[in-house]
A protein has these predicted regions:
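Secondary-structure capping and domain/repeat boundary segments
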Residues: 1-56
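Short, surface-exposed linear motifs at loops/turns and structural transition points
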Residues: 55-207
């Protein structure tokens, strides 16, 4: 027996194949944590349960922040929205950022030197501040504080029976760590940070 979106489908004896419907981003196998592409046929060998993935989108936040923890740098943030949170929280869907400098992007888009930052769980937590679907990616150890960086976020559906499909956000950033630091100072936000962070902000701003 198959259960798709809480509706049971009986597969008759000797007819052990099942063809998925037309959900936009496939069907998540709840028991095995994998995703099947829509319209494909599987062999049913046991009771199986699937949930459809009808919506999936990704948006990168236009503003850029400063990363203070561990190695400091510029931090980008993105949000994934979907109607299937169980699939989103599985390893079958992966996400991250592509980051490069503004000058490289202007000349080669993301075909030149690109830093790929995968979103990896830390301490068992996949999402930034425990906000489901939100994650960050950073470029650290920046030498030239005035050099501008750009980024785009991506989310990939890793189908078990087909090529992976990747969605990408618009390009955001066009900011330097010096520019972000000076914005914090000029707008009176520096008082919101502790002494260690304030010292870094002043350093990046060239104060």
């Amino acid at each position: 027996m198959n259960i798709v979106d809480n509706e049971a489908t009986t597969v008759e004896e000797g007819e052990n194949n099942y063809t998925f419907g037309s959900a936009e981003y496939g069907y998540f196998d709840v028991n095995n944590n994998v995703i099947y592409k829509s319209g494909t046929t599987i062999t049913v060998t046991e009771n199986m349960e699937f949930t459809s993935i009808n919506t999936l989108s990704i948006e990168a936040t236009k503003g850029v922040g400063i990363r203070f923890a561990d190695s400091s740098g510029l931090r980008f943030k993105a949000t994934i929205t979907t109607d299937n949170k169980t699939a989103l929280n599985s390893d079958a869907i992966t996400e991250g950022f592509l980051i490069t400098t503004n000058d490289i992007y202007t000349e080669n888009r993301f075909n030149g030197k690109v830093l790929t930052v995968e979103n990896k769980p830390e301490d068992g937590k996949k999402w930034f501040n425990d906000e489901e679907g939100k994650y960050c990616g950073s470029v650290v150890n920046i030498v030239d504080y005035t050099r501008k960086f750009v980024a785009k976020a991506y989310v990939t559906i890793n189908y078990v029976n087909a090529d992976a499909e990747t969605l990408e956000s618009d390009v955001v950033g066009y900011k330097s760590i010096s520019g972000v630091a000076n914005y914090i100072i000029d707008n009176g936000f520096i008082g919101n940070y502790d002494e260690k962070a304030q010292a870094l902000i002043n350093k990046f701003a060239g104060k």
